[in-house]
Curated annotation (Swiss-Prot):
InterPro entries: GLI_C2H2-zinc-finger, Znf_C2H2_sf, Znf_C2H2_type. Gene3D superfamilies: Classic Zinc Finger. Signal peptide: none annotated. SMART domains: ZnF_C2H2 (SM00355). Disruption phenotype: Decreases virulence in a mouse intranasal inhalation model and intravenous model for infection. Decreases virulence in a moth model. Decreases urease activity. Decreases levels of: laccase and melanin. Hypercapsular with mucoid colony morphology. Sensitive to: calcium; lithium; sodium nitrite; high temperature; sodium dodecyl sulfate (cell wall stress inducer); Calcofluor White (cell wall stress inducer); Congo Red (cell wall stress inducer); caspofungin (cell wall stress inducer). Abolishes filamentation during growth on glucosamine carbon source. Residues 166-187, 201-217, 286-324, 343-379, 396-412, 507-519 have a biased composition (Polar residues). Keywords: Activator, Cytoplasm, DNA-binding, Metal-binding, Nucleus, Phosphoprotein, Repeat, Transcription, Transcription regulation, Virulence, Zinc, Zinc-finger. It comes from Cryptococcus neoformans var. grubii serotype A (strain H99 / ATCC 208821 / CBS 10515 / FGSC 9487). The modification Phosphoserine is found at residues 103, 288, 329, 508, 569, 765, 810. It is found in: Cytoplasm, Cytosol; Nucleus. GO terms for biological process: calcineurin-mediated signaling; positive regulation of transcription by RNA polymerase II; positive regulation of transepithelial migration of symbiont in host; regulation of fungal-type cell wall organization. This is Transcriptional regulator CRZ1. Residues 148-159, 228-241, 252-262, 325-342, 477-493, 858-881 have a biased composition (Low complexity).
Length: 1094
C-alpha cells in the first residue's frame, strides 16, 4: 500500500486519466506511453487473475488469448511478427540498412514535454558486432544512481526460470519509493537486446514503412541468429558475456541465460508483459534525475576504469537487488555518489557466483590497459529535461566524488564520496535534504511560481581530477615527449630538477662555472662577466652546451644599474655580431644548409676578434711607437668624467704601471682625481675658519697644489663656470698694458670683459697679511683683475670717489655674492639709483660722482669699483663677510699707506685710451617665448636694460638684471644642497630657481591643478598643462587666476593669491646663511626670501 502522506507518483496521476484514443493523423499522447497493466489486461479480455507470466510461453498461446477484434492495432503487430519470422532480412519491403535516424514523432500539442529522447549514436561501420545497431536504452539511459540514507526497494526478484512464474506481485499502484524504478529486471538473455515493448498508440499513428524503419535497428538477436551453426551462435553469446551485459543483469542471471535457462524472445516479451511494462519503467527513469542504468547490455567495451562493487554478498544467501546487480555502468553520472567498498576487490570485479557455476571475469575496459577501447566516442550521460519540483523526482545529490589513486593499474578505482570537497556542483546541504528536486541548489524557492526546468547535458565535464579527460591525456603526452627530449647530455639529475621546476630549465649551480640567465646569482653576475670579452664568453658558453639551449638569450646578463658594473669591459660593452653568429654556428653540430654560402674565414672571426683586442691591450704597456694607443674619444674634454677615470684605472690594473699618456690626457686625469677627493657640501656644519697663512680648501691655491689647472673649474665643487680669462691664476702672460672695460664711456655702453694685467699679482689686504679665504668660491674672488686701476700709481687713483660701502650684505651673498662689487654701506636700491640714468641705462664713471653724493654712508675711506660691470663675472663681493677690509692688488699701493682721496679723479680718458673687443660667453640668453611671456605679464615699464650688445632685455627689478647678467657669462653660483644631484655641480644663475629646484627633492609641488589634481613645482609647468591636450578641460572648468588687467600672475602673485607658503610647516628645511656659505648662522630675512622669489 502506498503511504497516504506521500505525494502520488507521476504514473499514478496519469493512470487515473481516461484512455485517449489517437486518431490516424495525430501522434500518440502520453496516455499511450503510460499504458497501464490493468488496461492491457482488460483489453485482452482475460478472466484470469492479473499475474506475471513467465517468458517461456509461446507466441501461439498469446495469440489464442488475445482477441484481435477488440483492437485494430493487433493486426499490425501480427504483421510485424510475421515479417520478423520470414527471415529478418527484409521487413515489409524495407531493408535492414534503413536505420532510424530521428526520435519518435512528437506532437507539441498533445505529447508531454517531460519525454526526453536522444538521437541514436553513430554506429561503427553502420552495424554492431552481431550485425545490428545498439538499442536505444544503451544510448539514452545512464548509470545506476542511489540516494544516501534512503531505504532501498524491499522487494527482490529471483532469476526467471524455465516454466516458473515470477514471485513478484508489485502492482502499478503499490509503488512505495518514487525515487527508484519499480520495474525489476525481467532477466532478458544475453542475446536479447531488442525493444521489449512498443506502445499501442504509437503503432496506430504510423504506417508500415515508418514502423519498419524505426523498429529495424532494435530487433531480437536470436531471430537474426537463426540459421547459423550452433557453434557460431555459442561464440557470439560468449563474446557478449564478457562485456557490459553482466553490469545490468548480474553474473548469475547472465550465466543462467547463457546455459539456456533464460532464452526468450524480445518481441514476445514486448507483447505479453502483463505487469508494469518495461517502456514505462524506462520512461519513469528518463523523467527522473537519478539516471538508472538501462536493462540492455552493450556490445562495446567500457572506456572508463573499473569501479568496485559495493556490499558484495553471496547470491546463495541473499538475492541480488537491483542496485547490487549493477555495480558499474557504461557512463557514470556526475550526480551519482559512488559507494565505498568495504572489502578489497580483486583485479577483476565480479559478482559472487552461484554454487557450481563458472565465473567470467569482466573484460578490462580501462583506456590505460585497453588501448583499443573507444576513448572519445561515447557521451557520458544521456540528455534529459528535469522539472525539479515534480513530486516524483528525488533529491538532487550534490556530493562530489574523488578518485583513489592508491590502486594498481588493473585494480578497481574506488570512488569515495566526500561531502562538499570540490567537484562541479555545489556541496550538499544536509538541512535541505527534505526538499525535492533542485530546491537545495536552485535560486528559485520550491513553491515559487513559474517554470523550474533543469537540463541535464548529454556530455557533462567529468574526470578532471581523475586524469581521464582529453586535456589530461594531452598533458601526459606532452610531458612524456618533453621528458624524452631532455634525456641526453643534461643527465638524469638535471632532468629531475627540471621536472621539479614545472618544466622550466633551471640547472644546478654546480653544473657550470658561468652564471646563467635564470640562475639565482643575479647580483654578482655582471661583475663576473667583466673579466672576459665577448668572444671569450661565447666560447665558454659553447663548452657548457648553451648553444643548444633555445630557452635563454645567449650572452651575459647583468643588472641594469650602472653602479653595479664597477668597471666596464675594455671593448666599451660593444657587441660583435659576427662573433655571436660564429658562436651560434659552432654550437650546432649539423652542417649548414647547402644553399647557404659560408664566407671565407667566417669560422675564425671570433679568434681574430679576440686577438685584436689582446693586441690592443698589450700595446698599452709597450714602448714601441706603433703600439701607442690613440686618443680615446671618451678622454676628450666634454665627455663624462667617470668614463675616463674608469678607463685609466683599467689600464693601470691590466699593465701594472701608469699608461704613457700625452700631457693633455695626464692633465685631465689629475683633474679628475682631484675631483674625486673634493669636500662634500654639508649644510649642517658651519664652515671652518682658517688662520692667516693657511690654505682654504675652497681656494684656487689648494687646487694648484694638487696639480689642477683652472680650465677644469666647471667640474670642481665651489667654483663657477667662468671663462678662462677670469678664473686663471697661473700661466698668465707677462705685464702689459692695462686692460679695462669701456662700458662706461658716453658714446658706447658695452659689457666687455677686461683683459689680464699682471702675472705676479698677489692678493693683499689693506689691513696687512694674507687674506684667509679669498680663493675661488669666496666673496671678492677675481676683483683684482677687474680693477681699472691695476697698473696706475697711487696718485692717479687717490682722488677717485669709490662710492659707498654697505653695512648689510646683499641678499644674494648667501651663495657667492652679488657679483657687482658692492661694498658694505648703503642699500642696493640706492646703489642702483646712483649708477643708473633716467632712461634705465648705466651711467659712465665720470657722471656717477654727482649721483653718489647723496649716499648717506658715503665715505672717503671706502673703496669700490668704478663700474658695475667690472666684476660681474666674479663670484664674490669685494669684501669678506667678517672683515671690513677690502683686498686690492699690491701694485696699486706698493708700500704706501692708505691715503684718503681729496678730489675726484677724472678717469674718462682711461676709457678713451684703450678699448678692447667685447668678450662674453653668450650674446643672447633670453628666448623669444620667455621675453614675450615676461612682457605680457609686466605691470611696470622695464627700467633696467641689459648692457650686452644685441640683447636688449629689460627688467623691472635690479636683481632680475643681475641674474640675467650671470647668464651671459654662463655663471651658475647657486648650487643644489643635495649631494649627488647634477645641479649641485652645475648650479643655477638665479637663487629662486635653485630654491624651486630643491622643492623637488623634498617632494613639494606647490602648484596644483584644481581640475585633475595634478601637482607641479612651477607655475609655468601648470600653465603648460592647461595649454596641453590633456589639460584643456581643466583650463575651461578651472582657469588660472589673472590680474585685474587680465595679465597672467607671476609665481609670487599666485602664491599670495592662493596663500601658498614657500616653506610649508613641518618640512624641516632651514635655508640659513650657514648653508649658503656665509657662516653667520643667522636666518635669512623674510623680506630677502620673498624678493628673490620673483
Amino acid at each position: 500500500m502506498a503511504d497516504p502522506a506521500s505525494p502520488p507518483s507521476f504514473d499514478a496521476i496519469f493512470a487515473q486519466q481516461p484512455v485517449r484514443r489517437s486518431s490516424s493523423t495525430s501522434t500518440s499522447s502520453f496516455a499511450n506511453y503510460t499504458y497501464s497493466a490493468l488496461q492491457q489486461h482488460q483489453q485482452f479480455n482475460s478472466d484470469a487473475p492479473l499475474v506475471d507470466e513467465p517468458q517461456s510461453l509461446s507466441e501461439q498461446a498469446r495469440k489464442q488469448q488475445r482477441d484481435p477484434s477488440k483492437d485494430g492495432n493487433n493486426k499490425r503487430y501480427l504483421d510485424m511478427m510475421s515479417g520478423l519470422a520470414d527471415g529478418y532480412g527484409v521487413i515489409n519491403g524495407r531493408r535492414q540498412e534503413s536505420l532510424r535516424k530521428e526520435s519518435l514523432p512528437f506532437n507539441p500539442q498533445e505529447d508531454s514535454t517531460l519525454i526526453a529522447t536522444a538521437p541514436k549514436r553513430g554506429e561503427r561501420n553502420g552495424l554492431g558486432r552481431n550485425g545490428y545497431s545498439s538499442p536505444i536504452g544503451d544510448i539514452m539511459f545512464g548509470p545506476e544512481q542511489t540516494i544516501p540514507n534512503q531505504p532501498q526497494q524491499p522487494s527482490q526478484q529471483p532469476p526467471w526460470g524455465e516454466g516458473r512464474m515470477s514471485e513478484q506481485s508489485v502492482h502499478y499502484a503499490s509503488v512505495q519509493q518514487p525515487q527508484y524504478s519499480s520495474f525489476q529486471s525481467s532477466g532478458p538473455g544475453a542475446g536479447s537486446a531488442g525493444i521489449d515493448y512498443l506502445p499501442r498508440g504509437t503503432t496506430s499513428s504510423m504506417n508500415d514503412s515508418m514502423l519498419s524503419s524505426q523498429i529495424s535497428p532494435y530487433l531480437n538477436h536470436d531471430v537474426a541468429s537463426e540459421g547459423q551453426p550452433p557453434q557460431q551462435q555459442q561464440q557470439q553469446q560468449q563474446q557478449q558475456q564478457g562485456e557490459w551485459g553482466q553490469e545490468f543483469i548480474g553474473v548469475e542471471q547472465q550465466q543462467q541465460y547463457a546455459q539456456g535457462e533464460g532464452q526468450s524472445n524480445g518481441m514476445e516479451d514486448m507483447l505479453t508483459m502483463g505487469d508494469e511494462s518495461p517502456f514505462e519503467s524506462e520512461l519513469q527513469r528518463v523523467i527522473s534525475n537519478t539516471s538508472h542504468p538501462s536493462q540492455y547490455p552493450s556490445r562495446t567495451s567500457s572506456p572508463f576504469p573499473q569501479q568496485s562493487q559495493s556490499n558484495m554478498v553471496p547470491a546463495s544467501t541473499v538475492n541480488q537487488t537491483r542496485t547490487e546487480s549493477f555495480p558499474a555502468s557504461r557512463s557514470p553520472s556526475p550526480f551519482a555518489p559512488q559507494q565505498a567498498s568495504q572489502t578489497e576487490a580483486s583485479n577483476h570485479v565480479v559478482s559472487t557466483p552461484s554454487m557450481g557455476q563458472p565465473t567470467y571475469p569482466r573484460a578490462s575496459s580501462s583506456p590505460r590497459t585497453n588501448p583499443n577501447s573507444p576513448f572519445f566516442n561515447k557521451p557520458q550521460s544521456p540528455p534529459a529535461l528535469i522539472i525539479p519540483n515534480s513530486p516524483v523526482l528525488p533529491n538532487i545529490v550534490t556530493q562530489s566524488t574523488s578518485n583513489n589513486h592508491s590502486k594498481g593499474l588493473n585494480q578497481p578505482h574506488t570512488r569515495h564520496a566526500s561531502n562538499g570537497a570540490g567537484g562541479l556542483f555545489p556541496p550538499s546541504n544536509p538541512a535541505l535534504e527534505h526538499l525535492t528536486g533542485m530546491a537545495g541548489i536552485s535560486p528559485i524557492a520550491p513553491n515559487a511560481d513559474g517554470p523550474m526546468i533543469c537540463i541535464q547535458p548529454s556530455t557533462p565535464i567529468s574526470g578532471l581530477k581523475e586524469g581521464r579527460g582529453l586535456f589530461d591525456a594531452a598533458l601526459r603526452r606532452a610531458g612524456a615527449a618533453r621528458g624524452a627530449q631532455r634525456q641526453g647530455p643534461q643527465g638524469q639529475g638535471e632532468s629531475q630538477e627540471d621536472r621539479r621546476q614545472d618544466g622550466f630549465n633551471v640547472p644546478s649551480p654546480q653544473s657550470h662555472p658561468l652564471p646563467r640567465t635564470l640562475s639565482s646569482d643575479q647580483v654578482n653576475q655582471g661583475v663576473e662577466m667583466q673579466g672576459m670579452d665577448f668572444a671569450a664568453q661565447m666560447q665558454s658558453y659553447e663548452q657548457q652546451g648553451w648553444a643548444n639551449d633555445t630557452l635563454r638569450i645567449a650572452g651575459p646578463s647583468r643588472p641594469r644599474a650602472k653602479s653595479d658594473s664597477i668597471i666596464p669591459s675594455p671593448t666599451a660593452d660593444s657587441f660583435d655580431r659576427q662573433a655571436f653568429l660564429a658562436f651560434i654556428g659552432a654550437g650546432n653540430a649539423q652542417p649548414p644548409p647547402p644553399n647557404v654560402e659560408m664566407q671565407p674565414g667566417y669560422v675564425d672571426v671570433s679568434e681574430q676578434w679576440r686577438n685584436t683586442v689582446s693586441a690592443w691591450k698589450a700595446g698599452l704597456g709597450e714602448g714601441e711607437l706603433n703600439s701607442q694607443p690613440t686618443l680615446d674619444p671618451r678622454l676628450l674634454p666634454g665627455r663624462e668624467s667617470n668614463e675616463a677615470v674608469y678607463q685609466q684605472l683599467l689600464m693601470q690594473q691590466q699593465t701594472g704601471q701608469m699608461p704613457r699618456l700625452d700631457p693633455d690626457q695626464l692633465h685631465q686625469l689629475t683633474q679628475l682625481e682631484g675631483q674625486r677627493a673634493r669636500f662634500s657640501l654639508n649644510t649642517n656644519i658651519a664652515p671652518p675658519k682658517y688662520e692667516p697663512g693657511e690654505i682654504s680648501p675652497t681656494s684656487m691655491v689648494f687646487y694648484q697644489s694638487m696639480g689642477l689647472y683652472p680650465h677644469a673649474a666647471p667640474e670642481l665643487s665651489g667654483t663657477v663656470s667662468a671663462p678662462w680669462s677670469q678664473t686663471a691664476f697661473g700661466q698668465v702672460p707677462g705685464p702689459g698694458p692695462v686692460g679695462h672695460p669701456a662700458t662706461a664711456g658716453p658714446a658706447q655702453q658695452h659689457f666687455l670683459t677686461p683683459t689680464l694685467s699682471h702675472a705676479t699679482v698677489r692678493r693683499r689686504s689693506f689691513g696687512g697679511g694674507e687674506h684667509p679665504a679669498m680663493g675661488a668660491g669666496t666673496p671678492g674672488y677675481g676683483m683684482e683683475f677687474s680693477s681699472p686701476f691695476a697698473g696706475k700709481s697711487v696718485g692717479q687713483i687717490r682722488g677717485v670717489n669709490m662710492g659707498h660701502r654697505r653695512a648689510a650684505r646683499s641678499e644674494d651673498f648667501g651663495r657667492g655674492g652679488t657679483g657687482w662689487g658692492v661694498g658694505a654701506g648703503g642699500s642696493t636700491a640706492e646703489f642702483l639709483q646712483s649708477i643708473t640714468g633716467d632712461d634705465g641705462s648705466l651711467l659712465p664713471p665720470s657722471n656717477r660722482g654727482h649721483a653718489m653724493s647723496h649716499s648717506r654712508h658715503s665715505s672717503t675711506s671706502s673703496i669700490r669699483s668704478a663700474s658695475p660691470a667690472l666684476s660681474i663675472s666674479s663670484q664674490g663681493s669685494s669684501f669678506s663677510h667678517h672683515s671690513p677690509r677690502m683686498d686690492m692688488p699690491d701694485s696699486i699701493y706698493p708700500g704706501h699707506p692708505i691715503i684718503a682721496p681729496a678730489t675726484p679723479l677724472q678717469v674718462s680718458g682711461l676709457y678713451e685710451e684703450q678699448q678692447t673687443p667685447a668678450r662674453v660667453a653668450k650674446m643672447k640668453v633670453t628666448s623669444v617665448a620667455t621675453e614675450v611671456a615676461s612682457t605680457s605679464r609686466r605691470t611696470n615699464s622695464g627700467i633696467f636694460k641689459c648692457p650686452v650688445p644685441g640683447c636688449g632685455s629689460t627688467f623691472t627689478r635690479h636683481f632680475n638684471l643681475k641674474g640675467h647678467l650671470r647668464s651671459h657669462n654662463d655663471e651658475r653660483p647657486f648650487k643644489c644642497l643635495y649631494e649627488g644631484c647634477p645641479k649641485a655641480i652645475v648650479g643655477f644663475a638665479r637663487q629662486h630657481d635653485c630654491k624651486r629646484h630643491m622643492l623637488l627633492h623634498e617632494g613639494l609641488r606647490l602648484f596644483e591643478c584644481e581640475g585633475c589634481g595634478k601637482k607641479f613645482a612651477r607655475l609655468d609647468a601648470l600653465t603648460r598643462h592647461h595649454k596641453s591636450e590633456q589639460g584643456q578641460e581643466c583650463a575651461i572648468t578651472h582657469p588660472l587666476p589673472t590680474n585685474f588687467d587680465g595679465s597672467p600672475m607671476s609665481e609670487s602673485q599666485y602664491k599670495t593669491y592662493k596663500g601658498i607658503k614657500s616653506t610649508p610647516e613641518g618640512s624641516g628645511r632651514r635655508l640659513s646663511s650657514t648653508a649658503s656659505g656665509s657662516g653667520s648662522g643667522k636666518r635669512r630675512s623674510k623680506k630677502s626670501e620673498t624678493s628673490e622669489e620673483d
